């Protein structure tokens, strides 16, 4: 069994080992700095793949583009599977990898949204099974911390200029018009777009109500979830001029918040809708500052709604998105591949 080692790869490896499956992990990590280190790492990966693919019974790729690039090295009769995360198979990203995906014995998708998008495209496609990733951040049995008073918002995402879809700008515009009230926004994550966002916060007069925490380790991230009472991440799902898409393939931060007993504010379209249910576990809104501000005002006016929706989010997360369920789903999916 082979797959690319990423965060999901570690969860998959644990699930497979728990079910008694022998696993070999291959990845493309660098072997030194710069282009030379990257090239050496890729060359070693390809050599290991060429050797190992002739000694395994099944190959699982965690990236459609990677599968396409290595297919010439694979034995023709080697059954292969692929995991679909989201944007890498939406819109103009799909045609270059479509043939490789059609040659797979089976596909797994991190959300029903991504599965539906793929099946809406001309096929035929292999069977596509939805398997939601688990929230590895929280040790099993961790009890949720009490909710803080007021409105304590948290956003967890990279601050990359190339990924301005996570909703930071929407939140700044919404908060600028929220008015008085007991609220604060913590922004976790770092990247080259941070200076621009900080300047926007200052220009909107929100400097004393917004904290940029930068990149944090897991302990600090758990504390951030415990200090908030609403995960605010209205990620935009939209098509770029070149035909590529932005949006959440699943959105692990929504699940991490739910396990912590925190409700979420999200947009209506994207993989996060598998988890966030409007009026039950959070708010699903249109991608406008007006809609985001309206949801925030509702949360401020009715603090009990944060507790109710947070408790419902935790219950749903533990029942339908837990690690045991993930392990069982992976085992059942692989067993069905023959």
Give the ranges of each region predicted by the language model.
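Short His-centered aromatic/hydrophobic patch
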Residues: 60-67
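Conserved acidic donor-binding segment of nucleotide-sugar-dependent glycosyltransferases
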Residues: 277-290, 298-304
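Donor nucleotide-sugar binding/catalytic pocket of nucleotide-sugar-dependent glycosyltransferases
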Residues: 103-141
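Nucleotide-activated donor-binding/catalytic signature segment of Leloir-type glycosyltransferases, i.e.
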Residues: 195-222, 230
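Acidic donor-binding loop of glycosyltransferase active sites
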Residues: 226-247, 262
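A short, well-ordered alpha-helix in the C-terminal region of glycosyltransferases
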Residues: 209, 298, 305-320, 326-332
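Short hydrophobic beta-strand element within catalytic cores of glycosyltransferases
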Residues: 254-259, 263-266
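Conserved donor-binding/catalytic core segment of Leloir-type glycosyltransferases
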Residues: 145-166, 172-175
